[in-house]
């Protein structure tokens, strides 16, 4: 029955009931996490810029493929494999996120982060040099694997190299670098797509970053060992290998189902249903394996089940997934709207994102600075959720004739709302977690962000394709389904050019209506954020209390 003892009970046992050596190792680990920042001045400036820049690359790689897909199709002539370009990256990110956070809690953060950067760069090099689309897909998967570890590593390095008071500010800065990469992705991709060097340099450009950043990581980034005094053999033996395999299998089949359903295969096809069934079965087996600690221990499970017993972490998880829905959907569909309705190029459509992303980034930075200063976090979720709801509803009302100025205004409202709490959960979770749980807590929130964004985009894309296809075929009944889907995906623009002006306007109205329908997802996410914010405590998390407790917070649910 000892395996059912809670973490709190374990911590309250007398020393005689626990290994003295284990207690000493945990104390050392906690001291490592709580230590003051050891690097300052110009060295710290160079290190933090290098770390945050890797987030730019990660976010750039998320959006850069969208605008070079037509050129990739023309190179390899395999339209049926087009969805794999995004699915491979997303599958690798989602499936390995929790695993990376667990590894970061065992191994040296500096060297593990460096390994992930190299992995990401190797994947990018594979994509750039790919002789076949299968190699390109493999490179995307490898880049996603390294990118997931890189992102968890950034959050871990920021948490262990900053004080608790300044941590929200630096985590807020990840929003700035994420925004820069998100905006640059379509612009850089579109620029290379129409240039003489070609789309392959959209991936090769990442290698220049590695040439500059890796020496900085090697010689200036402080080393951080989360488990000093523990042999690497013991650390590796404590990883949950069975849970890792089950989770990867469940995530891969699940992401494939929601991304391929309605696009490559009908939702009721055997292929789609099989993926859902396999994913469901594997998730059930994974849950049982984690609950009963089969092939692992309670402390070493892949998924941080201990957070499921803490209401605060459950709320933070759902809040993070909800806000990911709020800002990921418009980031992908705003450029699409302008490409269809204003005949924008890929570069121009990417620039149209600036009002949205700039205000998301500004709100993220403001959140990091003010939350560090005043300590309260609940108002950010409540006010941010309200503004996100207003902005999402306004985006839902967009018609073919809606002015560009109005659309920019809607985007600004949505950007401010989403940015107010987009990254806040990382700092809040790290503040609420025990020091040695910080890497796992970081991965827990990162998993929510990736899962929310992945599921939202998959559903939004399916809704758009189905609604747009049905609307276009109602206007042009003679067009084949394959021709319509090819035109919607961007693989062929000749379809729209052959239409009469009146018919083209009706088709664009159908496309605009289909795009407006995807904003039901951000509306739902924002409404969920408001509902959950009401149940969040009115507490100060980042300001030291008079009693000198570690967090300086009141218990969950306290209203003072």
Swiss-Prot record:
Q: State the residue spans of region: Disordered.
A: 1-32
Q: What happens when the gene is disrupted?
A: Does not affect the production of the naphthoquinones derived pigments.
Q: Does the keyword Nucleotide-binding apply?
A: no
Q: Which SUPFAM superfamilies does the UniProt record give?
A: MFS general substrate transporter
| Short name of one Pfam family | MFS_1
Skewed-composition ranges (Basic and acidic residues):
21-31
Task performed by this protein? MFS-type transporter; part of the gene cluster that mediates the biosynthesis of pleosporalin A, ascomycone A, as well as a third cryptic naphthoquinone derived pigment, all responsible for the coloration of conidia. Seems not to be involved in pigment biosynthesis although its expression is regulated by the cluster-specific transcription factor pgmR.
Q: Name one GO cellular component term.
A: plasma membrane
Q: Which GO terms describe its molecular function?
A: transmembrane transporter activity
What name does the UniProt record give this protein? MFS-type transporter pgmG
Source organism per UniProt: Aspergillus terreus
Membrane topology qualifier: Multi-pass membrane protein
- InterPro entries this protein is in? MFS, MFS_dom, MFS_trans_sf
Which PANTHER family does the entry mention? MAJOR FACILITATOR SUPERFAMILY, MAJOR FACILITATOR SUPERFAMILY (MFS) PROFILE DOMAIN-CONTAINING PROTEIN-RELATED
Write out the transmembrane intervals.
45-65, 84-104, 111-131, 141-161, 174-194, 201-221, 242-262, 275-295, 313-333, 346-366, 378-398, 409-429, 440-460, 515-535
Q: What triggers or suppresses the expression of this protein?
A: Expression is positively regulated by the pgm cluster-specific transcription factor pgmR.
What are the protein's UniProt keywords? Glycoprotein, Membrane, Transmembrane, Transmembrane helix, Transport
Q: Where is the signal peptide?
A: none
């Amino acid at each position: 029955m000892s395996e059912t003892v809670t973490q709190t009970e374990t911590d309250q046992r007398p020393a005689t009931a626990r290994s003295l050596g284990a207690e000493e190792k945990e104390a050392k680990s906690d001291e490592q996490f709580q230590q003051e920042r050891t690097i300052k001045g110009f060295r710290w400036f160079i290190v933090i810029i290098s770390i945050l820049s890797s987030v730019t690359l990660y976010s750039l790689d998320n959006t850069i493929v969208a605008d070079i897909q037509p050129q990739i199709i023309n190179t390899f002539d395999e339209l049926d494999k087009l969805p794999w370009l995004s699915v491979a990256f997303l599958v690798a990110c989602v499936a390995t996120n929790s695993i990376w956070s667990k590894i970061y809690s065992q191994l040296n953060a500096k060297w593990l982060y460096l390994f992930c950067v190299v992995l990401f760069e190797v994947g990018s090099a594979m994509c750039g040099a790919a002789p076949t689309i299968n190699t390109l897909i493999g490179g995307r998967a490898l880049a996603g694997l390294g990118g997931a570890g890189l992102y968890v590593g950034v959050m871990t390095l920021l948490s262990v190299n900053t004080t608790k008071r300044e941590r929200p500010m630096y985590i807020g800065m990840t929003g700035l670098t994420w925004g820069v990469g998100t905006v640059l992705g379509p612009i850089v991709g579109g620029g290379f797509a129409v240039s003489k060097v070609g789309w392959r340099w959209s991936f090769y450009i990442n290698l220049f970053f590695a040439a500059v950043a890796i020496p900085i990581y090697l010689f200036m980034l402080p080393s951080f060992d989360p488990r000093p005094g523990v042999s690497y053999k013991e650390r590796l033996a404590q990883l949950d290998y069975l849970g890792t395999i089950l989770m990867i299998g469940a995530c891969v089949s699940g992401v494939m189902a929601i991304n391929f359903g309605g696009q490559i295969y009908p939702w009721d096809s055997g292929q789609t249903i099989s993926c859902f069934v396999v994913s469901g079965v594997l998730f059930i087996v994974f849950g049982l394996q984690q609950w009963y600690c089969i092939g692992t221990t309670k402390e070493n499970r892949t998924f941080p089940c201990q957070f499921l017993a803490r209401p605060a972490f459950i709320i933070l998880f759902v809040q993070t997934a909800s806000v990911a829905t709020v800002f990921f959907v418009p980031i992908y569909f705003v450029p699409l709207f302008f490409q269809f309705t204003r005949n924008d190029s890929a570069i121009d459509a990417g620039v149209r994102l600036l009002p949205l992303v700039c205000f998301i980034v500004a709100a993220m930075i403001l959140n990091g600075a003010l939350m560090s200063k005043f300590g309260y976090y609940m108002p950010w979720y409540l006010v941010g959720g309200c503004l996100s709801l207003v902005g999402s509803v306004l985006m839902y009302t967009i018609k073919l004739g809606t002015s560009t100025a109005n659309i920019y205004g809607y985007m600004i409202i949505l950007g401010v709302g989403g940015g107010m709490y987009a990254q806040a959960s990382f700092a809040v979770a790290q503040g609420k977690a025990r020091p040695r749980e910080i890497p796992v807590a970081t991965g827990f929130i990162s998993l929510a962000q990736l899962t929310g964004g992945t599921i939202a985009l998959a559903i939004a894309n399916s809704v758009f394709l189905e609604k747009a296809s049905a609307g276009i075929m109602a206007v042009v009944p003679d067009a084949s389904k394959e021709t319509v889907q090819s035109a919607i995906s961007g693989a062929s623009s000749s379809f729209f050019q052959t239409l009469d002006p009146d018919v083209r306007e009706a088709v664009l109205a159908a496309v605009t209506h289909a795009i407006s329908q995807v904003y039901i997802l951000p509306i739902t996410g924002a409404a969920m954020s408001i509902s959950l914010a009401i149940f969040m405590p009115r507490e100060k998390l980042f300001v030291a209390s008079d009693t000198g407790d570690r967090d300086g917070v009141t218990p969950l649910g306290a209203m003072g």
